[in-house]
Amino acid sequence: MFMKKLPDRKYIEMLYYVRLGEHCDLNRPETFNEKLNWLKLYDRDPKYTKMADKYEVREYIREKLGEEYLIPLIGVWDSTKEIDPSALPEKFVLKCTHDSASVVICRDRASFDFDEAFRKLDEALSRNYFYPAREWVYKDIRPRIIAEEYMTDESGTELKDYKIFNFGGKPELIQVDFGRFVHHERNLYSTEWKLLPETFEYPRNGSVQIEKPENLEEMLRFAAILSEGIPSVRTDFYSINGRTYFGEITFYQEGGFGHFSSKEYAEKLGELIKLPEKKHE
């Protein structure tokens, strides 16, 4: 309770030191993480909350890209008590709208443990995701559950999402995660699909050959459209059987506390973030 009462800036400075072992200079921010935390405090555009809401963002995608780039929606509910398991298809994905990582995947409804899934979702619904890292975009999102179609690629391989880092509407970096439920690894690529030597939070694996998606140029074009006028934002997409689908939008990667392989690279990315005038004090 005491931690919740701390002013946002004081809390961020304290957590930054705990997580990264260094001072967070919010008066003269230079690194990627410092600037993300500055943006948390002083760039609070109300539209960001809608963009971070996994249900409301669908309208934003319809307006900017089109309905066909959305994963089909099965339903939306305020509580697990409203969900009728028998009305769901054999395969589906449940996720909370107001946080990150509260996702449950069902590949076979007959053997699916609904009690455990609902317990996990209910626990997530009870939390305000703003507090752990003071990511203000989540603070006023209405907690709900959505169900989306379970999407598969004809190749049968693990479905990958391509996380594109954008700065002022310009895509600059692509993150691809793999082995998240076994041994989490993460590769970083240039927009020309060159594997980069740097790491961000998770180890790199240069021996893993990830083919350049055939629709990469389309994803980069969409990323530029969605991020126009925003100092820093990540836009995620799936490539499924050659088609592009929107994933989600993230404003503060790793909550603004991600570990980089070098201070130099953290500063290099930080240089790409052009801070706006303060919109909040």
Would you name each region that the model predicts?
Residues 68, 157, 166-172, 228-232, ...:
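Coil-to-beta-strand transition motifs
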Residues 140-144, 187-246:
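A long amphipathic alpha-helix within ATP-dependent nucleotide-binding catalytic cores
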Residues 28-109, 116, 122-136, 144:
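A conserved helix-loop-beta module that forms one wall/lid of the active-site cleft
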Residues 77, 98, 149-151, 166-168, ...:
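Short, flexible loop/turn elements at secondary-structure junctions
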Residues 1-43:
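Membrane-proximal basic amphipathic "stem/tether" segments
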Residues 239-281:
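C-terminal active-site "lid" helix and adjoining low-complexity regulatory extension at the edge
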Residues 88, 113-202:
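Phosphate-binding site of ATP-dependent enzymes
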Residues 58, 81-84, 100-105, 113-114, ...:
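Short catalytic/ligand-binding loop motif for oxyanion handling, primarily in non-cytosolic enzymes
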